[in-house]
A protein has these predicted regions:
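A general structural motif
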Residues: 21, 46, 141, 166-167
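Catalytic core of the metallo-beta-lactamase
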Residues: 106-165
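Pre-active-site segment of Zn-dependent metallo-hydrolases
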Residues: 1-47, 51-104, 150-161
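Conserved small/polar residues in nucleotide/adenosyl-binding loops
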Residues: 169-172
């Protein structure tokens, strides 16, 4: 998906072994936030994927659809000879997507989730899409907030975004 140089990045080796990753925190279910997860699972990731309940449910739909389309695209490329590869492959399969969906664990908004070693994570409503959140990760000595994508302060359909707890010392 996207420009050629970005598509090629999907096929490059991940910078660390996916087997070494223990946990993934997800802000929302748009493809640019969850679409590579099945490739990580295919390559050995077996930890938990934490997200809000709505994000877990939407991600299941998005990933099944993306896998279906990727498999059909590969079949179409093979049948019509427009791939430079002798046997075009999808980035991930429907089986990879199903294994990924099985790793999702739903968490509640505004609850500190123990990540171990004194680290916690807290999801706060982002108002971007159903289930979206900013995630605050805190250690005993510091914290950082990853916003993902933010919605409007006053949204006509979704609950408005909320400000994550904690001090604001730096904004990047």
């Amino acid at each position: 998906q996207g420009e050629k140089n970005l598509r090629e990045l999907n096929w490059a080796p991940f910078p660390v072994s996916p087997k070494s990753v223990e946990l993934i925190l997800v802000t929302h279910a748009h493809t640019d936030h969850v679409g590579y997860l099945p490739a990580l699972v295919r390559d050995g990731f077996a930890g938990e994927i934490l997200a809000t309940q709505a994000t877990c449910e939407l991600a299941a739909i998005v990933l099944r659809d993306a896998a279906y389309l990727a498999e059909r695209d590969a079949e179409h490329a093979a049948a019509n000879g427009y791939s430079k590869h002798e046997q075009p492959l999808p980035l991930f399969t429907e089986a990879d997507a199903e294994r990924t969906i099985g790793l999702f664990r739903a968490i509640d908004y505004d609850s500190d989730i123990d990540l171990g070693d004194g680290w916690t994570a807290r999801w706060t409503r982002a108002g971007h899409i159903l289930g979206s959140a900013s995630i605050r990760v805190a250690t005993p000595s510091a914290s950082v907030v990853f916003s993902g994508d933010l919605g409007r302060a006053e949204h006509p359909v979704l609950r408005a975004r909320e400000i994550p707890p904690g001090d604001r010392k730096s904004v990047v």
